[in-house]
């Protein structure tokens, strides 16, 4: 079985690379100068997952039919929620729900929202990776209720799409949802530490020893 690298730095490296490539595209032609995008990355070692996002994509973790956690985004509305100036239930309708504080393609460095500790998997866990057009038009309770009604996950997704299309909004943003269900879980392994950082620490220790001697 393949054992991919599994740590915080892997996601950060991929985010930085994506940001670099989008900025390179911006410089190719004037028509791409305003190009920006949101990004959500999930990695796994077959026992746990780590995820991170930039922009207004969203990640949902469903266990036992209920949403047990979801990611935060980089919108002004989310900032207001974090500062307790806005109720989370009102976020979907706030006029600044799509005003981003950062996105892939921004000048300078980005600061991805990456969880610090891995989430241990359980069989039948469900993960949903979505764009803003999905989450701003779907209530989390409706996601749970529809899931309880349909054993077939395709029917569940179809029911959610119908809810989006029935939205009363004048304009519906691009809506995308990718759903993953865990069928089996591997035995646990320790999270791999970044080897390059370890080498730098070893070199630094050697240099200090040499100086002291």
Write out the residue ranges for each language-model feature.
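PP2C/PPM-type serine/threonine phosphatase catalytic domain
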Residues: 1-213
């Amino acid at each position: 079985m393949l054992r991919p690298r599994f740590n915080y730095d892997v996601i950060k490296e991929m985010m930085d690379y994506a940001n670099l490539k989008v900025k390179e595209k911006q410089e190719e032609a004037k028509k791409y100068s305003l190009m920006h995008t949101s990004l959500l990355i999930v990695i796994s070692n077959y026992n746990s997952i780590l995820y991170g996002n930039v922009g207004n994509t969203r990640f949902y973790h469903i266990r036992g039919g209920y949403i047990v956690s979801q990611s935060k985004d980089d919108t002004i509305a989310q900032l207001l929620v974090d500062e307790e100036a806005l109720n989370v239930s009102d976020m979907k309708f706030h006029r600044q729900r799509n005003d981003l504080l950062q996105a892939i393609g921004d000048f300078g460095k980005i600061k991805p929202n990456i969880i610090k500790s891995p989430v241990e998997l359980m069989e039948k866990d469900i993960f949903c990776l979505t764009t803003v057009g999905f989450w701003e038009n779907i209530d989390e309770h409706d996601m749970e209720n529809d899931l309880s009604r349909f054993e077939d996950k395709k029917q569940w997704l179809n029911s959610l799409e119908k809810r989006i299309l029935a939205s009363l909004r004048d304009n519906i943003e691009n809506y995308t949802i990718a759903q993953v269900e865990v069928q089996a879980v591997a035995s646990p392994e320790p999270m791999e530490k970044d080897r390059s950082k370890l080498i730098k620490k070893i070199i630094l220790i050697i240099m200090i020893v040499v100086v002291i001697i």
